[in-house]
Amino acid sequence: MSRRCQITGKGVLTGNNVSHANNKSRRRFLPNLQETSLLSDILGSAVRLRLSTNGIRTVEHNGGLDAFLLSTPNRKLPTEAQALKRRILRAKEKKAEATA
């Protein structure tokens, strides 16, 4: 399981710890990832994702998982999010066919 947000693509960064005496030692800056379940209205079920806390805020700010994915262009989404977006689009088309 990679340390990367499945919505925003935020991952591990590297840098230095710098002491008061200006000694440098390498370190890793890990993203604050949380395993969360987000409800998809179109799919009618909860989707488990590994998101950064910033990614959770972004999804909620944009009106939920479905609204966020449908309004975001594919070039800005990681591959996992693009696959989920395709699932949502297919389910939306099936619902449109069923009502028509």
From Swiss-Prot:
Name the HAMAP family on file: Ribosomal_bL28 (MF_00373)
Species per Swiss-Prot/TrEMBL record = Gluconacetobacter diazotrophicus (strain ATCC 49037 / DSM 5601 / CCUG 37298 / CIP 103539 / LMG 7603 / PAl5)
Query: Which GO terms label this protein's molecular function in UniProt?
Result: structural constituent of ribosome
* Keyword flag Cell cycle: no
UniProt name for this protein: Large ribosomal subunit protein bL28
Q: Does the keyword Ligase apply?
A: no
> Known PANTHER family for this protein?
39S RIBOSOMAL PROTEIN L28, MITOCHONDRIAL, LARGE RIBOSOMAL SUBUNIT PROTEIN BL28M
Name of the coding gene: rpmB
Protein family:
Belongs to the bacterial ribosomal protein bL28 family.
One Gene Ontology biological process:
translation
Show the Gene3D superfamilies listed in the entry.
Answer: Ribosomal protein L28/L24
* Pfam families in the cross-refs: Ribosomal_L28
Q: Any idea which UniProt keywords this protein has?
A: Ribonucleoprotein, Ribosomal protein
Cellular component, GO annotation: cytosolic large ribosomal subunit
